[in-house]
């Protein structure tokens, strides 16, 4: 599902909201999650999962095209850990509850 599809689904499920308002809400949620991660904060959505950042140490990598060894700098990457309820829904194929 793309962000556009998510917005369309949410707008269809909530006809009392304008599509542009739903788009603004979704964009605000993504922006706030991104800002929190940029600050190094943890974002926990109960029943869904938690977003955190993890540090990847510097290492020596290999260019797959040339085989040349290259230095890969240390970096911070976003990480998502699914919550118990989300894992159970995915494993059981159960639709989301309203």
UniProtKB/Swiss-Prot annotation:
Span of the signal peptide: none
Protein name: Integration host factor subunit beta
GO MF annotation, one: DNA binding
Origin species: Gluconacetobacter diazotrophicus (strain ATCC 49037 / DSM 5601 / CCUG 37298 / CIP 103539 / LMG 7603 / PAl5)
InterPro entries: Hist_DNA-bd, Histone-like_DNA-bd_CS, IHF-like_DNA-bd_dom_sf, IHF_beta
An annotated GO BP: regulation of DNA-templated transcription
Cited function: This protein is one of the two subunits of integration host factor, a specific DNA-binding protein that functions in genetic recombination as well as in transcriptional and translational control.
Recorded family membership: Belongs to the bacterial histone-like protein family.
Subunit record text: Heterodimer of an alpha and a beta chain.
GO terms for cellular component: chromosome; cytosol
PROSITE patterns named among the record's database cross-references: HISTONE_LIKE (PS00045)
SUPFAM superfamilies cross-referenced by the UniProt entry: IHF-like DNA-binding proteins
Keywords carried by this UniProt record: DNA recombination, DNA-binding, Transcription, Transcription regulation, Translation regulation
């Amino acid at each position: 599902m793309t962000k556009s599809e998510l917005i369309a689904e949410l707008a269809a499920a909530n006809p009392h909201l304008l599509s542009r308002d739903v788009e603004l809400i979704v964009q605000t949620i993504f922006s706030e999650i991104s800002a929190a991660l940029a600050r190094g904060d943890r974002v926990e959505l109960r029943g869904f999962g938690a977003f955190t950042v993890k540090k990847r140490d510097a290492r020596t990598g290999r260019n797959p095209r040339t085989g040349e060894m290259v230095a890969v700098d240390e970096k911070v990457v976003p990480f998502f850990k699914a919550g118990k309820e989300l894992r159970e829904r995915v494993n059981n194929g159960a639709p989301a509850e309203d």
